[in-house]
Amino acid sequence: MNTPLHHIKNRTKILPPLRVGIGGPVGSGKTTLLEMLCKGMRERYDLVAITNDIYTKEDQRLLTESGALPADRIMGVETGGCPHTAIREDASINLEAIDRMLVDFPDADIVFIESGGDNLAATFSPELSDLTIYVIDVAAGEKIPRKGGPGITKSDLFVINKTDLAPYVGASLDVMAADTTRMRTTVKGLKPFVMTNLKTLSGVQEVMAFIESKGMLRSGDAATLRDGR
């Protein structure tokens, strides 16, 4: 049985769903961010989620047990290899998962795709994701933003998570913000970044607002036109 989101009525689909990729190293908070996004946006949008793990479906289990979405709206994918391959070089396993999910939920507004934990070079194929969010955590070290890599420099939104841990690991949030600003400034301006503490929901509203704005979404009864779609 496919679980509807009953509070969303009379929806008129205009476009395919927005596909939002969430990447980052192991333990950075990708699954927790996805949980918070689902809980914060499910009253306005029809959501489904795809999670990636190498050998298990642990993230699918965690999302299901947290009540982020009904169980049948969360699909776990076992990549069985290097995580970035399944989101970049050969995204077919995830593209197939999206197709299968949309057969069951054709009115979905947003498909979240969470990658398996990977390094700073991981990026989503444009065939798989319309928007990319890359998550790091403060505990990994103050130096991470200035190391660069596609996740830091090219993602549509860069998230620096676990800001509450900064005093305990000797990290300066001001330094991390300055380094991030330098690494994400292009000829077109500064690409956005957000600092979050998901334990207190700090920064979550900013992430949701970014998805709505950049993804050209509108709460209510209909999806609207989006850039390039």
From Swiss-Prot:
Q: Which cellular compartments is it found in?
A: Cytoplasm
Annotated binding of GTP, by residue: 24-31
NCBIfam families given in the database record: ureG
Q: Note the Pfam families from the entry.
A: cobW
Q: Which family does it belong to?
A: Belongs to the SIMIBI class G3E GTPase family. UreG subfamily.
Q: For this chain's UniProt record, which GO biological process terms are given? A: urea catabolic process
SUPFAM superfamilies, A to Z: P-loop containing nucleoside triphosphate hydrolases
> Gene name, please?
ureG
Sum up the protein's function in the record's words. Facilitates the functional incorporation of the urease nickel metallocenter. This process requires GTP hydrolysis, probably effectuated by UreG.
InterPro entries named in the record: CobW/HypB/UreG_nucleotide-bd, P-loop_NTPase, UreG
Q: Name one GO molecular function term.
A: GTPase activity
GO terms for cellular component: cytoplasm
Instruction: Give UniProt keywords alphabetically.
Output: Chaperone, Cytoplasm, GTP-binding, Nickel insertion, Nucleotide-binding
Q: What is this protein called?
A: Urease accessory protein UreG
Quaternary structure (record): Homodimer. UreD, UreF and UreG form a complex that acts as a GTP-hydrolysis-dependent molecular chaperone, activating the urease apoprotein by helping to assemble the nickel containing metallocenter of UreC. The UreE protein probably delivers the nickel.
The answer to whether UniProt assigns keyword tRNA-binding to this entry is no
Is GTP-binding there in the keyword field? yes
